Amino acid sequence: MTSLTLYLIIFSIILYLFVNRNKRKNLKIPGPNGIPIFGNLLSLSGEMHLTLQEWYKTYGSVFSIRMGNIDTVVLTEYPTIRKAFVDNSLAFASRYQLKSRVVLTGAKDLAIQNGEIHSLLKKVVLSEMTTTKIKRMEIHIIKETEKILKILDKHAERGEPFIINNYLNMFSMNVILRFLLGIDYPYENVDETVGYVKSIKSFFAVAGLPILSDFIPIPLKKSGVFFDSYKELEIETDKLIEKFKKSRNEKIENGTYNEEEDESILSKLLKEYEHGNITWECVSHTCIDIISAGTDTSANTLVMALIELINNQEIQSKAFSSIRSSCLNDSNDDDDDDEIVITHSKYRSLLPYISMIIKETFRKHPIALLGLPHVTTEDVEIDGYKIEAGTYIIQNIFSSHRSDKIFQSPNEFIPERFFESSQNQGLIHFGLGVRDCVGKSLAECEIFTLIATLLNRYQFINPNNSKKLNDIGTFGLAQVCPDTNIILKKRI
């Protein structure tokens, strides 16, 4: 880059900021002071959720920050977020489409699309994620559970420490692939999927961090982990889609295709594409959204739940006792107590303590620490503050779940807090309003089934009794869990 080019860029930035200096929004909303050009951006590198937590403690449930030249409001606590995303849902429903994400996907994916196309994509996905459909497809979750048990049994027989993360990633990925494409990967080939899972993790680790060119007028660098990891996801996902299309077309040609029996989400997306209702990019990028989000969020929740159960053995023992006393009397007489798969549809109502453990994991370790960004489409008042149209909105989920105004002893893992149904309303781990998580019912089903079944079958042990397992993840679009080394002991 020549000196003249550099000077022109700097001059352009200064001129742009000078012209826009009097266009600041939300000046009456409290918040930390920023610095020229960058605003508060430089304070938000690294563990961004922890910085926002400190500012929440200082400025309250509604505070403003400046991300470059973009006016931003951060909302914390369930009552405040509900007022915005439920009571004023139309004003807060739209996604803020950052430049980097638009370049990455063309804004063609389910996650950041707005308007009629988003409504259509959501309708297609939700049509295969209803409670009735999930119950009918629960056999796939049962089969995945049985397959992972065979692998974990071998580790239990060896009695040696091993890292469990990849197996849980494989489980979650296979469940979502079953719903999306009607396929899965064998667990014996876990190493073959590590690259795919690694790309998901790499992308999610950086996708939540601010990219300077999204917030200040400088050229976007179309390289680095953000773009490279997504490109890898795109390549691998397109291979799966093409394989699915080939199989589907062959069945159509030879007359063996039964549309009514094809319950995969991709078949419904392809149908909309073939009718000209969506573009091919919508199909491809929405599949990436579903696979990556469905894999990483559920798997990381499972890892965090097991970490807490290992660090709190009394909770693990209580959970095991509740399973043995509450639901196994309901099983067939010829079933061994440690052999059954404890399904969500049959046993959830019989095992309230398992549900409490899962809710407490959602609370203490929300995987989407800040959700996805929204933008206000009209002026709206929240908690006495006027938030202007065009404001970038952050749902401060992590701080909401760790607020002592909402939860007593918020840094402790206490499943019993959910004995009181009122505490359920403090949870916003799946988001709130019309843009909440489309896969929440499936996630709850698979997480309950695996956690309950694993607790019934194994005791989970820390290889190092002198030190608790690390329960602190790192910031990303989805929280990245630490690699977790454990020992399994088969229950007798």
Curated annotation (Swiss-Prot):
Enzyme Commission number(s) from the entry: 1.14.-.-
SUPFAM superfamilies, A to Z: Cytochrome P450
Highest taxon listed in the record's lineage: Eukaryota
Transmembrane regions: 1-21
UniProt KW keywords: Heme, Iron, Membrane, Metal-binding, Monooxygenase, Oxidoreductase, Transmembrane, Transmembrane helix
CDD domains registered for this protein in UniProt: CYP1_2-like
Gene Ontology molecular function terms on file: heme binding; iron ion binding; monooxygenase activity; oxidoreductase activity, acting on paired donors, with incorporation or reduction of molecular oxygen
Subcellular location per the Swiss-Prot or TrEMBL entry: Membrane
Entries under Pfam families matching the protein: p450
Cofactor list: heme
Binding site for heme: 437
Cystine connections: none
Gene3D superfamilies (UniProt xref): Cytochrome P450 (1.10.630.10)
PROSITE patterns assigned: CYTOCHROME_P450
Main location: membrane
Membrane topology, from the record: Single-pass membrane protein
Any Gene Ontology CC annotation: membrane
Membership in a protein family: Belongs to the cytochrome P450 family.
PANTHER family associated with the record: CYTOCHROME P450 513A1-RELATED (PTHR24303:SF11), HEME-BINDING MONOOXYGENASE FAMILY (PTHR24303)
Protein name: Probable cytochrome P450 513A3
Organism: Dictyostelium discoideum
